[in-house]
Amino acid sequence: MCEAFPESLPHGPVAVNVAVSAFKEATVTVISTPQEYNQEDLYIDLEAITGHQLFLKCEGFNFAGSVKLKAATAMVEAAERDGLLTPDSILVESSSGNLGVALSVIAASKGYRFVCVTDSRCNLSARLLMEALGSQIHIVTDPAPVGGLLGARIDHVRALCASDDRYVWLNQYANPNNHMAHYRTTAPAIARAFPDLDVLFVGAGTTGTLMGCARYFRARHRRVRIVAIDTEGSTTFGHTPSRRMIPGLGTSIRPPLLDTSYVDEVVHVNELDTIRTCHRLARHGFVFGGSTGTVVSGATQWLAQREEPVTAVAIAPDLGERYLETVYQTNWVQDLYGGDALQPRAVAVTGPTV
């Protein structure tokens, strides 16, 4: 079996809340599987750091360390309900790191075998974490003539599926459960916390988080402006592909999930600016991943070009521990980007390109 596109969609994990009494009453959360827990309502006020009122929704406080746990949980549970996964199935997925870790967590919890097809840009810590969880890692090194390393990863996944019908490819790039996970969880949580929201900044990778949030706000809160944050060198919004070294946001193949009619603006961020933003946040005690650095950088630049005050939220997809050997390593940064890597640099704000 190669691809799983289940029609039924999940309602997401639910934690069990119980009250215990010992001298005073306390509320605790009890779970039996790692995918049941996700810190949904944690925001950081970044005004003191960025100079603009910007609230950062932290999505990395779960057992997978990133927003990808939501999509992974939704896709696996839907495939189970639709009978696409059996005890003999082998999950396989192309991932630059975060979804691979999330699927590794779920596979370990449920007893599935999992093969993550990644490439040389995947951080070592992410690979080691997946292996610690019992997953197999296949690393693609040669880019495909069309689609680059992502295209090569997908080709490898298809070859595995063709070789053994036990493989089940959830296909995060086209699976509707990817964006519906955020339509049902992430977006409503933001709407509840910020009923007067003006603008939402969302990073664009597979575009699952982007499309789930964009579709929700279009349907229920049309006034909210959706600004997609992409990385320079990504082809997602029609730009010419170029070298990208930081895994996470950006693609070399336009994601099938993307519908640009739901996107109001696009900000493209240079990787140098991503690195500078990560370091700036770290100087204030917040160590975030490259995807979060890109989102905060793009949001800050967009806000700097607006004179009127707005209520703005940005989604932080990940934390920074998996980037300690890259984004936060001086030698790595200087080898790839030069000695002036921490000098300020502007980013471009554009309308969506179809």
Task: Write out the residue ranges for each language-model feature.
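PLP-dependent amino-acid enzyme catalytic core
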Residues: 1-354
